[in-house]
Amino acid sequence: MGERSWPATPGEGWSAADRPPLLVSACLLGVACNHEARANTSEAVVALRRTRRLVPVCPEVAGGLPTPRPAAEIQPSGRVCTAAGDDVTDAYERGAAHAVRLARAVGATGAVLKARSPSCGCHEVYDGSFTRTRVPGEGVTARALRAAGVPVWSEEDVEAGTVDLQPGDEGR
């Protein structure tokens, strides 16, 4: 896939096709797909639509998990399990592979993912004890996207203004 040059600033009549694509956790855009069948809408992320083509993805649903579904956490072994002990790692890996394929297909210049999710967390995740204890780490999809060369950020990065996702600012 060839490199595309994006306009430095959005102009009048800038169509969605002219905006650099950004993969986004669907729950951040208002889709009720989290494990509780709720959205985690982030207005700061939704506002990126003014300068970006937002491409929604829910890796957990894409991996075959239902909505709602039992909460899951990454265990110290690296497996993803529910509190009842069901191993759902394969579904998480299928969802991550789908997200990587989607990012490549649309030429995504980055991804904004749900913080602390076992799929999408990109700075920290829960430790696997189901006590809401946070540890440094990445979710399955965040790790796969980063390994594929796609920069990843959380909605908290966008909300805090620690990343500027204007066209041309990828990787900052």
What is the role of each PLM region?
Residues 30-37:
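Short N-terminal binding/cap micro-motifs at the start of the first secondary-structure element
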Residues 112-130:
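Internal, conserved structured core segments that host functional sites
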Residues 27, 114-117, 157:
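Short, well-ordered beta-to-alpha junction loops that form the rim of enzyme active sites
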Residues 21-27, 56:
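Short, hydrophobic/glycine-enriched beta-strand segments
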Residues 106:
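Active-site charged/polar residues at nucleotide-handling catalytic sites that mediate phosphoryl
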Residues 109:
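Short acidic/polar active-site loop segments enriched in Thr and Asp
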Residues 40-81:
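Short, surface-exposed acidic-centric catalytic microdomains
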Residues 2-12, 17, 62, 70-74, ...:
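Divalent-metal-activated hydrolytic enzyme cores
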